[in-house]
Amino acid sequence: MSGRGKGGKGLGKGGAKRHRKVLRDNIQGITKPAIRRLARRGGVKRISGLIYEETRGVLKVFLENVIRDAVTYTEHAKRKTVTALDVVYALKRQGRTLYGFGG
């Protein structure tokens, strides 16, 4: 290894990728049955049709906040990989302590 630290076969500094996949509308990947299963787990018997889009919106905002905090922890530690502990600390910061993943 020629002094590249941990990692392996890094060629250069990265730069722009040729074909960058455009990420859009991924929230639709949270399907109606998936939302229904989560509601069932929470003890819900009947679900209004309007719930699905509302749930997607709320989930998107929640995940954006958690991911933003987790990435902030990662950047502060001068790392490029978000670890499970970063997510645990981000959740703890928002008052949603999660046990079982270290920390």
Curated annotation (Swiss-Prot):
Which residues carry the post-translational modification N6-acetyllysine, per the record? Answer: 17
Q: Where is this region: Disordered?
A: 1-20
- List GO terms (cellular component aspect): nucleosome; nucleus
Q: What's in the keyword line of the UniProt record?
A: Acetylation, Chromosome, DNA-binding, Hydroxylation, Methylation, Nucleosome core, Nucleus
Instruction: Give the UniProt subcellular location, in the record's own words.
Output: Nucleus; Chromosome
Locations of Gly residues compositional bias?
Answer: 1-14
Positions carrying N6-succinyllysine: 32, 78, 92
Positions of post-translational N6-methyllysine modification: 21
> Record's SUPFAM superfamilies?
Histone-fold (SSF47113)
* Principal location class: nucleus
Residues bearing N6-butyryllysine are: 6, 9, 13, 17, 32, 45, 78, 80, 92
How does it get modified after it is made? Answer: Butyrylation of histones marks active promoters and competes with histone acetylation. Glutarylation at Lys-92 (H4K91glu) destabilizes nucleosomes by promoting dissociation of the H2A-H2B dimers from nucleosomes.
N6-propionyllysine sites (modified residues): 9, 17, 32, 45, 78, 80, 92
Q: What are the N6-glutaryllysine sites (modified residues) in this protein? A: 6, 13, 32, 60, 78, 80, 92
What the protein does comes down to: Core component of nucleosome. Nucleosomes wrap and compact DNA into chromatin, limiting DNA accessibility to the cellular machineries which require DNA as a template. Histones thereby play a central role in transcription regulation, DNA repair, DNA replication and chromosomal stability. DNA accessibility is regulated via a complex set of post-translational modifications of histones, also called histone code, and nucleosome remodeling.
Quaternary assembly: The nucleosome is a histone octamer containing two molecules each of H2A, H2B, H3 and H4 assembled in one H3-H4 heterotetramer and two H2A-H2B heterodimers. The octamer wraps approximately 147 bp of DNA.
Query: What family does this belong to?
Result: Belongs to the histone H4 family.
Protein name as annotated: Histone H4
According to its UniProt entry, this protein's organism is Styela plicata (Wrinkled sea squirt)
Tell me the lineage of the source organism. Answer: Eukaryota, Metazoa, Chordata, Tunicata, Ascidiacea
